[in-house]
From Swiss-Prot:
Modified residues (Phosphoserine): 167, 212
Gene source species: Homo sapiens
Signal peptide: none
Subunit structure: Homooligomer. Heterooligomer with HAPSTR2; the interaction is direct and stabilizes HAPSTR1. Interacts with HUWE1.
Keywords linked to the UniProt accession: Cytoplasm, Nucleus, Phosphoprotein, Stress response, Ubl conjugation
Function, in words: Acts as a central player within a network of stress response pathways promoting cellular adaptability. The E3 ligase HUWE1 assists HAPSTR1 in controlling stress signaling and in turn, HUWE1 feeds back to promote the degradation of HAPSTR1. HAPSTR1 represents a central coordination mechanism for stress response programs. Functions as a negative regulator of TP53/P53 in the cellular response to telomere erosion and probably also DNA damage. May attenuate p53/TP53 activation through the E3 ubiquitin ligase HUWE1.
Location(s), subcellular: Nucleus; Cytoplasm
Keyword Oxidoreductase carried by entry: no
UniProt region (Disordered), positions on chain: 32-51, 155-181, 204-227, 250-275
Name of the protein: HUWE1-associated protein modifying stress responses 1
């Protein structure tokens, strides 16, 4: 067991991150590690920047000189003696203020340059350290998230797109439910026309055998019924039938009842019942 463990550790070390880089990459990494130090001209400034008390004391000393020179200039102007020129106090005050301004600007610029150099070096150091811990292939989103200081987005498995097959019955039911309101009116009209044709066929008088009792007894009633139907306006009759068949409540019951009454009164129905 111990031998296997040692072999596994050796294999991990053999295939570790340091073995992922080529010879040229290792050389570049070594040079980058050597360049982590600041240039010689900025090393002293960096050492001084590490001790800000020294810079603050120097600036404070220059400020005291400037304040003293300005106060002396004001004093000499108020208490001016005959034959004493104000040029010397003015020159001293101007020199002190100029030195204070120049030293402040230089200190700010040097601190700014040192900050930029240190920032570059720290950035390169962090990126190289991050690259050493990664695999040979680095994802673009990982690099961007590291540089921007954000969490990388979740990785979705890039599975091949699957085609969703919808059964014909399901598709038909979906289409039917979505277009019920569109196809409802023609469907109702077809039912109404079908019921109207059935009613007209029932109302029409069918011929029976000449000389039969049924034919003789129902001849006068049929003739009167035909005359009454001719008097009724066809458009009114169609409108009434359409209204009956398009009605939502009890439509089919009323239609069946009316058709049954008409068929009962028809001569053909009487003939069949008597037979």
């Amino acid at each position: 067991m111990e031998e296997r463990k040692e072999e596994g550790e050796a294999e991990i070390q053999e295939h570790g991150p340091e073995h992922w880089f080529s010879k040229w990459e290792r050389q570049c990494l070594a040079e980058a590690e050597q360049d982590e130090q600041l240039p010689p001209e900025l090393q002293e400034e960096a050492a001084a920047a590490a001790q800000p008390e020294h810079k603050q004391q120097k600036l404070w000393h220059l400020f005291q000189n400037s304040a003293t020179a300005v106060a002396q200039l004001y004093k000499d102007r108020v208490c001016q003696q005959p034959g004493l020129s104000l040029w010397v106090p003015f020159q001293n005050a101007a020199t002190a203020v100029t030195n204070l301004y120049k030293e402040s600007v230089d200190t700010h610029q040097r601190s700014f340059d040192i900050g930029i150099q240190i920032g570059y070096q720290r950035r390169n150091k962090d990126v190289l350290a991050w690259v050493k811990k990664r695999r040979r292939t680095i994802r673009r989103e990982d690099l961007i998230s590291f540089l921007c200081g954000k969490v990388p987005p979740p990785r979705n498995s890039r599975a091949p797109p699957r085609l969703t097959v919808v059964s014909p019955n399901r598709a038909t039911s979906t289409e039917t439910s979505s277009s019920v309101e569109t196809d409802l009116q023609p469907f109702r009209e077809a039912i109404a026309l079908h019921g109207l044709s059935g009613a007209m066929a029932s109302i029409s008088v069918r011929s029976s055998t000449p000389g039969s009792p049924t034919h003789v007894s129902s001849g006068s009633n049929a003739s009167r019924r035909r005359n009454g139907l001719h008097d009724v306006d066809l458009n009114t009759f169609i409108s009434e039938e359409m209204a009956l068949h398009l009605d939502n409540g009890g439509t089919r019951k009323r239609t069946s009842a009316q058709c049954g009454d008409v068929i009962t009164d028809s001569p053909t129905h009487k003939r069949n019942r008597m037979i």
